[in-house]
């Protein structure tokens, strides 16, 4: 008797339902996976009926309410609606493994980066959710590209978004440790020496003797006047780990950066983060942030360029005081 392999393969694929609650019922779940929790059903139902077409969405689910599964179901729903490629972003590699384990447990198709740096074809084709970590996307040498040369995405979800914020900010920051890169540190101190003496001679002496608790900002006019010399120093040492991933982001934007010097390190950071540099996130059709705690609303608007309406009206369950807003 001939075996119908097509039929067997078809039985292992997800029925193309777009309602995430109905979709959950079609998954090839392992026996340990039970029904959806009430909190999950609330969020999924209200997203599907009220916020499905929103470009920007913030979901707040308290610890233990199963936000990982909610995120995976939302992205699978969007994939089934042909709104891929879909990207699930975690704050670190450890949580990537956790999310992959959840996806496997619930029978949701996913892919990850293998040993090579190539973006998986299953992601590009819109057939599987790509699960990765925030550093993979937000760096000056990102495999997803920067500026006008970026990989187009349909839907991007950032899990534990509050934990991702610091990583995104640090992607634009060069931090030069005196202990790891004494030569670069010394060259920069020499470059700004005269101007820093004028700013505060005593504090500058403390910095030169290695005082960890003293730091000074390079005056904007001094930074602007010596930006070419500064670029030469950084360009010549851009292969250093502390410079390598940030250099492409700041090399043509140095006038929009500022510099702080302490006895232990030099930090060069922008006045404002330019999230549009990362088009795979910035220009996605749908952008979803998930978190158990949201403390830095201002960065969602100013940094990630989320709409104020998305910050004001969040999707989630009420807290014990009944204060959290729902969709």
Regions found by a protein language model. Give the residues of each.
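Conserved SAM-binding loop
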Residues: 36, 88, 130
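Conserved pre-motif I regulatory segment
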Residues: 2-60
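Conserved Walker A/P-loop ATP-binding site and its immediately adjacent core
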Residues: 63-115, 136-139, 296-299
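Conserved catalytic network of the ASCE P-loop NTPase/AAA+ motor domain
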Residues: 79-81, 122-124, 147-151, 279-282
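Internal, well-ordered domain-core segments that constitute the primary functional module
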Residues: 116-118, 131-138, 148-163
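Conserved coupling segment at the C-terminus of the helicase ATP-binding
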Residues: 25-28, 41-42, 48, 52, ...
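A short beta-strand-to-loop transition that corresponds to the Sensor-1 phosphate-sensing loop
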Residues: 92, 128-136, 160-161, 290-294
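Conserved motor-coupling elements within RecA-like helicase/translocase cores
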Residues: 105, 116-130
């Amino acid at each position: 008797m001939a075996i119908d392999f097509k039929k067997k393969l078809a039985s292992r694929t997800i029925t193309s339902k777009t309602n995430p609650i109905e979709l959950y019922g079609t998954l090839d779940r392992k026996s340990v996976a039970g029904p959806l929790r009430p909190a999950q059903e609330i969020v999924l139902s209200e997203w599907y009926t009220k916020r499905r077409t929103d470009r920007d969405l913030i979901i707040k689910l308290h610890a233990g309410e199963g936000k990982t599964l909610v995120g995976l179901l939302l992205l699978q729903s969007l994939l089934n609606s042909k709104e891929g490629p879909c990207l699930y972003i975690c704050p670190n590699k450890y949580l990537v493994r956790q999310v992959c384990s959840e996806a496997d447990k619930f029978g949701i198709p996913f892919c990850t980066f293998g040993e090579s740096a190539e973006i998986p074809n299953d992601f590009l084709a819109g057939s599987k959710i790509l699960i990765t970590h925030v550093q993979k996307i937000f760096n000056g040498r990102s495999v997803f590209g920067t500026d006008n040369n970026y990989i187009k995405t349909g839907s991007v979800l950032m899990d534990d978004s509050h934990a991702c914020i610091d990583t995104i900010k640090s992607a634009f920051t060069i931090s030069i440790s005196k202990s790891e890169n004494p030569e670069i540190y010394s060259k920069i101190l020499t470059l700004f020496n005269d101007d820093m003496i004028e700013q505060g001679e005593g504090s500058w002496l403390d910095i030169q003797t290695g005082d960890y608790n003293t730091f000074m900002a390079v005056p904007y006019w001094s930074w602007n006047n010596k930006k070419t010399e500064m670029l030469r120093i950084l360009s010549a040492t851009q292969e250093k780990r502390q410079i390598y991933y940030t250099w492409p982001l700041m090399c043509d934007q140095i006038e929009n950066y500022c510099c702080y010097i302490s006895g232990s390190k030099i930090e060069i950071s922008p006045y404002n983060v330019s999230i549009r540099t990362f088009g795979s996130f910035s220009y996605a059709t749908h952008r979803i942030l998930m978190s158990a705690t949201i403390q830095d609303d201002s960065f969602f608007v100013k940094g990630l360029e989320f709409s104020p309406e998305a910050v004001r009206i969040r999707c989630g369950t009420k807290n014990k005081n009944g204060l959290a807003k729902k969709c």
